[in-house]
Amino acid sequence: MTHALFSPFTIAGISHHTASVADMESVRFPDEEAFLTRAGDWFKGVILLQTCNRIEIMVHGNADLLGTFLESEGRAGWQMWKDADALSHLLDLAAGLDSMVIGEDQILGQLRKSLSLSESMSVADPLITLCINKAIHAGSEARRISGINRGAVSIGSAAVLLAEEQLGSLAGRHILVLGTGEMGVLVTQALAAKQLSAIYVANRTFDRAQCLAEKVHGTAVPMADLYRYLTMSDVIICCTAAPHPVIKVQEVMEALKGRSWPLDHSRRPLIIVDIAQPRDVEEDVGKIPGVCLYTIDDLRKVNDDTAQFRKEAAEKVREFLDQELVQFIRLFNRKAADELLATLHSWAEQIRIRERDRALSRLSGCDDRVRDVTDDLTRVLTRKLLTDVTLTIRTCAERGEMKIAEDLVGAITRGENICSRTYD
């Protein structure tokens, strides 16, 4: 079976594999809805996936057009996958093979959320919707057959492991979690088993902080009291969705003045792990004496005792995804052919109705029976005339021969451009 696609599909991506936190911040799209609106004018379908360690743009369109669009957006440095390679990359994403923490589950929810946003803005066409749903299904199945997501496998849990490595143990420590979104929930869940003395949860919306704090027997913190609780904390893990830094140099320096406890022989170090994107903590906070600032870039070095198991499980996942790719291409091409055929049949139906009405107008005074027979006759003739064409286009789809199919449609329509190539 060929790996050619019947319609163009492209992914442009930047991730932790090739870029630092700062690099990803420079190309991030702060207003996702505005981006999708602009992209929707260029492509039949578009998905924007932005997480703490990757930005992926998936389009029903070709790589050259996507490259031109990104240049117009002032964004450069993207890695491109096109057609079958793009489908393969999407499967890797959904299965967690491309994640910083191999096998993590969060990517599935992030893909669903991205698709939902595109659907709500009417920029997810049937083909790109098929791609995301198929990838999510394959990713879920890959985890089921391999167990690759066994153990502590999330950016949130990796942040907790990093803090634990720096302090030796989190038992008896005071931890402040800033943010109550999906990542904040994962962080607090990972902390719940660490025998902490106290866990504080801060969020811009205090009710959400209270809700999460209650689940882990912690203390909700109003944002107005953030730096007072910073003074009492050994570790701060930051994971808000704020578009600007929340923890700033001057305020941290002030808070540190009251940080020593009466029985401390020396000033306790403050560990800050910033896993937000864009960053929650001003970069210069890491230069303050007594503060150790870590970002997503540092999570690559975390010693996770389940990593070796997941690496071995990844081999099983790879075999499964290789098989899934063949089916994925078949589904993709079938859906693309359906779209082309729907356009062709719609064009033919318009001609049928026009010619039927013209014939009936020449049969002045005809009764309903004549009208019904004429309608049936034109309908049957149209269907029969398109039968062989339909079969040929489906065969072209199986082979990924889009150009042959479009040339055939062009011959039938005498060059009338019923299949807009704007997105090719």
Curated annotation (Swiss-Prot):
<feature type="binding site">
    <location>
        <begin position="51"/>
        <end position="54"/>
    </location>
    <ligand>
        <name>substrate</name>
    </ligand>
</feature>
<comment type="pathway">
    <text>Porphyrin-containing compound metabolism; protoporphyrin-IX biosynthesis; 5-aminolevulinate from L-glutamyl-tRNA(Glu): step 1/2.</text>
</comment>
<keyword id="KW-0627">Porphyrin biosynthesis</keyword>
<feature type="active site" description="Nucleophile">
    <location>
        <position position="52"/>
    </location>
</feature>
<dbReference type="Pfam" id="PF01488">
    <property type="entry name" value="Shikimate_DH"/>
</dbReference>
<dbReference type="InterPro" id="IPR015896">
    <property type="entry name" value="4pyrrol_synth_GluRdtase_dimer"/>
</dbReference>
<dbReference type="InterPro" id="IPR018214">
    <property type="entry name" value="GluRdtase_CS"/>
</dbReference>
<dbReference type="InterPro" id="IPR006151">
    <property type="entry name" value="Shikm_DH/Glu-tRNA_Rdtase"/>
</dbReference>
<protein>
    <recommendedName>
        <fullName>Glutamyl-tRNA reductase</fullName>
        <ecNumber>1.2.1.70</ecNumber>
    </recommendedName>
</protein>
<feature type="binding site">
    <location>
        <position position="99"/>
    </location>
    <ligand>
        <name>substrate</name>
    </ligand>
</feature>
<keyword id="KW-0521">NADP</keyword>
<dbReference type="GO" id="GO:0050661">
    <property type="term" value="F:NADP binding"/>
</dbReference>
<comment type="subunit">
    <text>Homodimer.</text>
</comment>
<dbReference type="InterPro" id="IPR015895">
    <property type="entry name" value="4pyrrol_synth_GluRdtase_N"/>
</dbReference>
<dbReference type="InterPro" id="IPR036291">
    <property type="entry name" value="NAD(P)-bd_dom_sf"/>
</dbReference>
<comment type="function">
    <text>Catalyzes the NADPH-dependent reduction of glutamyl-tRNA(Glu) to glutamate 1-semialdehyde (GSA).</text>
</comment>
<feature type="site" description="Important for activity">
    <location>
        <position position="89"/>
    </location>
</feature>
<dbReference type="InterPro" id="IPR036343">
    <property type="entry name" value="GluRdtase_N_sf"/>
</dbReference>
<comment type="similarity">
    <text>Belongs to the glutamyl-tRNA reductase family.</text>
</comment>
<feature type="binding site">
    <location>
        <begin position="179"/>
        <end position="184"/>
    </location>
    <ligand>
        <name>NADP(+)</name>
    </ligand>
</feature>
<feature type="binding site">
    <location>
        <begin position="104"/>
        <end position="106"/>
    </location>
    <ligand>
        <name>substrate</name>
    </ligand>
</feature>
<dbReference type="Pfam" id="PF05201">
    <property type="entry name" value="GlutR_N"/>
</dbReference>
<dbReference type="Pfam" id="PF00745">
    <property type="entry name" value="GlutR_dimer"/>
</dbReference>
<dbReference type="GO" id="GO:0008883">
    <property type="term" value="F:glutamyl-tRNA reductase activity"/>
</dbReference>
<dbReference type="GO" id="GO:0019353">
    <property type="term" value="P:protoporphyrinogen IX biosynthetic process from glutamate"/>
</dbReference>
<dbReference type="InterPro" id="IPR000343">
    <property type="entry name" value="4pyrrol_synth_GluRdtase"/>
</dbReference>
<feature type="binding site">
    <location>
        <position position="110"/>
    </location>
    <ligand>
        <name>substrate</name>
    </ligand>
</feature>
<dbReference type="InterPro" id="IPR036453">
    <property type="entry name" value="GluRdtase_dimer_dom_sf"/>
</dbReference>
<keyword id="KW-0560">Oxidoreductase</keyword>
